[in-house]
Amino acid sequence: MNFLFSKVKCWLLLLPGMLFACSAQSVKKESISLIEGSPAVFAVEESYQIFLRIRKPALVKIKVGRSVFSGHTNGIRPSGSKVHAFTVPGKLLDKVGLYEVICQELPERRPYMREVKRFPEKSFMYEFKALPAENVRIFHIADIHNRITQATATAAAAGKFDLLILNGDLVEHMASPSSLETALVLAGNMTGGRLPVICTRGNHELRGKFAENITQYMPNHQGKLYYQVKCGPLYAVVLDGGEDKSDSHPAYGNTIDCTSFRKEQLEYLRSSALREEFKVAQSKYKLVICHIPFPRYMGKSTADEEKRLFTVYGEWSKELKTFLKPHLIVSGHVHRKLIQHGPDFPAPVLMGAALDKKTDIVSGSMLTLAKGKINVDFIDHLGKKGSGERISNP
């Protein structure tokens, strides 16, 4: 879909349905009223995690081809949660190219459900586009700090893409339950539930009253926010740098233990199972995705505890450089649009998003994967494009 952005004001792009309007005529209004916005389809390991926001208490299930996924937890189908999540095999959804959301309103849940009025099931069909084998376009954005309108407009200005990366600091802090849904809102707005999304947590998502509940609203692998992604010609390792200062910093009030969390990820990178995955991935486009551009901090030393923080970033970098040999590290955090190279870096580091708090201009980046190379261009929500850089496979 092409947008003549210079001739259309930003708010016009944000009509109901956002960037993608469903064309299915068979969808009933009752079904639409149950589903808030569009689904978000996150790539995790070899699966997709489909997140839905439901306005009323309801039973929800996903159907892909002949396979049905109920989203049960230990045999119980949830009905009271606003957010419902389902894991479906990646190869299955890629092949079928279509999934059905089936909702059944359930206003009351009793020990014996025959006493409760039963509502009919209503369905909503979504097309899904798997990544192409070549010429993959990836739109990347981070550090929007609640500027949902501008971020959605930046995605529109970027034009057509095949995969979305939401790379942290999407909020200022987790102040309310709605803050937890920000990634789901953005993913739905920008893809309409039709494209895969990779999502990371930024340091600002660790802050606030509701920060501890984030895994209920965000893609994860067995509760962990670090994992690998196998999606078409792309292989990625998603890492989480946690907070950007030492655990003992007075701003955190002893509420975090990112030191242990980073060491846990180091052990993950050192695991023999993951190293075997790295060998298999050598024919793919290889990315490392992390909100904090960790290679640029390794080797720095200030206070003893912060020195340990920067040391573990160096260990991460060493493991990745030795065994994965990634083509690009994709990050945000610094609110700058640049690509940094370093002799000890595992790969060039893209800092591919920016927020100018004086003007509220939000910028992202477009990565094009083609013919063994990655091309990077920058764009803001006003449609202004910046020069990019081409990175060849090592």
Predicted regions and their residues:
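Active-site neighborhood of phospho(di)ester-bond hydrolases with catalytic His/Asp-centered motifs
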Residues: 140-143, 164-169, 196-203, 288-291, ...
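Extended active-site neighborhood of metal-dependent phosphoesterases/phosphodiesterases
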Residues: 102-124, 181-279, 315-316, 325-326, ...
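Active-site-proximal segments of metal-dependent phosphoesterases and phosphodiesterases across multiple
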Residues: 279-327
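Short, flexible/disordered intra-domain loops and linkers
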Residues: 177-180, 248-257, 298-312
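Bacterial N-terminal signal peptides that target proteins for export
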Residues: 2-12
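Bacterial N-terminal signal peptides
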Residues: 11-19
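An acidic-aromatic substrate-binding cleft motif
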Residues: 115-166, 172
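Acidic, histidine-bearing metal-coordination/catalytic regions of metal-dependent phosphoesterases
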Residues: 10, 22-139, 372-394
